[in-house]
């Protein structure tokens, strides 16, 4: 019989994703066939699963931790925010439609069937399935029709472990308050709790553990400190991105403006792992640093809206000055589209039908089209003459004079563009910098020739270290019962 557990949180960003990844790797190290599952995720950081279709990149990472191919069934409902109130809905890897918050609440009961079907698909042949909730089950205003937390757990009969984040303060109130506010049907699904992100002497919190157990009746399954290995894994979403800071003496400064609907920003994690690179995320209200040698425009879930926001920040002027100073610019996917002369959306796929002026840094034009390209891709760098791997997730077609100088070929067709002076380049290929050989060639073009890290190997090692850290601090009896 397949074992199951679901990690839910007292709030968002309490560390569920990392804990699930670590437990998945730990089970794998113990020889178990384990798979991750997240019924509903909200993120513009998407991956192309090995069986085709989009899932959250967190679930892609968790599949890597399990040592199994990623599948659309690992994240059957993915919400990709396009505005403050609306999202694109991906169901089992495919576009289902778009909806604003209130409309989506009405849609959720229709999606439960797909969620349960995907869960059954994953359970087949697995020793263990580790499920990750979303947000908090204490958001009882969202309980009706819920598919992300207790609504799923009660229907699928999956025991729940509640995760509380002590670093943000108030963890006792968060756990006890969750117990108090949940209906009895949901409370009885919870088998225990984990305190996450602890700093300092754990013995000082012994009375806190006693108080939580006294008020809730739940046992503690362990106190998890700040995990060193977690810092070597890609952050899941822009909430984590806002807190990222990097103090580096790297010789090469690379700037990435944080767009409102930034997507797939884990494209840049391989660059951040390089000792010779000082990767700077530029927040709204900050200028692009004048001493950056390279500026990379990231992907976006709303190219036209983010282009307007970019101008509102004055980053368009910063980019023009950067190029005049001899700096280089790379655009990835939506960032590539912004670099051109125009972006047209005649069907209103991102909002009202319109055509807007681009940054004019590449002689190209883009028109949005309803057919979405979603695929893993083998590619070839024309600039450095080397094989690449990556993935595509985009709407629209791009053409123009600079496309006659393509950056890559993808599946044998030309992709991207390079300016006449060679200073500006764009491509639709995500995952470009994850290719170690390409990253080394790029750094060498800036005079950095001291080698690069093996990025995939570094992530695998971080997952191993994470698993061992968790094994040393979590309750042994609980782990034995879970993993066997």
Curated annotation (Swiss-Prot):
Keyword set for this entry? Cobalamin biosynthesis, Glutamine amidotransferase
| Gene3D superfamilies assigned to the protein according to its UniProt record, in alphabetical order | 3.40.50.880, P-loop containing nucleotide triphosphate hydrolases (3.40.50.300)
Plastid found in the keyword field: no
Pathway membership, UniProt: Cofactor biosynthesis; adenosylcobalamin biosynthesis
PROSITE patterns from the UniProt entry: GATASE_COBBQ
**A GO term, aspect molecular function:** ABC-type vitamin B12 transporter activity
Q: List the disulfide bonds.
A: none
Q: Which InterPro entries match?
A: Class_I_gatase-like (IPR029062), CobQ/CobB/MinD/ParA_Nub-bd_dom (IPR002586), CobQ_GATase1 (IPR033949), CobQ_N (IPR047045), CobQ_synth (IPR004459), GATase_3 (IPR011698), P-loop_NTPase (IPR027417)
PANTHER family per record: COBYRIC ACID SYNTHASE (PTHR21343:SF1), DETHIOBIOTIN SYNTHETASE (PTHR21343)
Function of the molecule: Catalyzes amidations at positions B, D, E, and G on adenosylcobyrinic A,C-diamide. NH(2) groups are provided by glutamine, and one molecule of ATP is hydrogenolyzed for each amidation.
What name goes with this protein? Cobyric acid synthase
From which lineage does this chain's organism come? Bacteria, Pseudomonadati, Pseudomonadota, Alphaproteobacteria, Hyphomicrobiales
């Amino acid at each position: 019989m397949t074992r199951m557990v679901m990690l839910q949180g007292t709030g968002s960003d309490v560390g569920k994703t990392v804990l699930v990844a670590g437990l998945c790797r730990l089970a794998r190290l113990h020889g178990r066939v384990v798979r991750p599952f997240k019924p509903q995720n909200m993120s513009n950081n998407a991956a192309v699963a090995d069986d085709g279709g989009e899932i959250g990149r967190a679930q892609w990472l968790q599949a890597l931790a399990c040592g199994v191919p990623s599948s659309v069934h690992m994240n059957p409902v993915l919400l990709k925010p396009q505005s403050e109130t609306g999202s694109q809905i991906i169901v089992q890897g495919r576009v289902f439609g778009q909806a604003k918050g209130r409309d989506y609440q009405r849609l959720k009961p229709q999606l439960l069937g797909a969620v349960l079907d995907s869960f059954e698909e994953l359970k087949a042949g697995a020793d263990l399935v580790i499920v990750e909730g979303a947000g908090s089950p204490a958001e009882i205003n969202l309980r009706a029709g819920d598919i992300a937390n207790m609504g799923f757990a009660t229907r699928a009969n999956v025991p729940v472990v509640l995760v509380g984040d002590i670093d943000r303060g108030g963890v006792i109130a968060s756990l006890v308050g969750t117990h108090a506010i949940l209906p009895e049907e949901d409370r009885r699904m919870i088998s225990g709790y984990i305190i996450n992100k602890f700093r300092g002497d754990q013995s000082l919190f012994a009375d806190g553990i006693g108080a939580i157990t006294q008020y809730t009746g739940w046992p503690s399954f362990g106190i998890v400190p700040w995990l060193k290995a977690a810092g070597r894994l890609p952050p899941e979403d822009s909430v984590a991105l806002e807190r990222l800071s990097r103090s580096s003496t790297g010789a090469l400064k690379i700037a990435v403006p944080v767009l409102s609907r930034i997507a797939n920003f884990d494209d840049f994690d391989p660059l951040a792992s390089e000792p010779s690179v000082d990767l700077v995320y530029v927040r709204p209200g900050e200028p692009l640093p004048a001493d950056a040698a390279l500026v990379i425009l990231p992907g976006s879930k709303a190219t036209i809206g983010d282009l307007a926001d970019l101008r509102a920040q004055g980053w368009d002027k910063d980019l023009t000055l950067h190029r005049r100073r001899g700096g280089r610019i790379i655009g990835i996917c939506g960032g590539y589209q912004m670099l051109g002369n125009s972006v047209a959306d005649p069907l209103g796929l991102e909002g009202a039908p319109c055509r807007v002026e681009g940054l004019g840094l590449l002689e190209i034009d883009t028109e949005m089209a309803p057919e979405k390209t979603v695929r893993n891709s083998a590619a070839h760098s024309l600039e450095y003459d080397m094989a690449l791997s990556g993935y595509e997730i985009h709407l629209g077609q791009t053409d123009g004079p600079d496309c006659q100088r393509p950056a890559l070929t993808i599946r044998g067709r030309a992709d991207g563009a390079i300016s006449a002076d060679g200073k500006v380049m764009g491509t639709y290929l995500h995952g470009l910098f994850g290719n170690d050989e390409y990253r080394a060639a790029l750094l060498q073009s800036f005079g950095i020739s001291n080698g690069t890290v093996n990025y995939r190997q570094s992530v695998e090692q971080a997952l191993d270290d994470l698993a061992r850290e968790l094994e040393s601090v979590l309750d042994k009896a609980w782990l034995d019962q879970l993993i066997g």
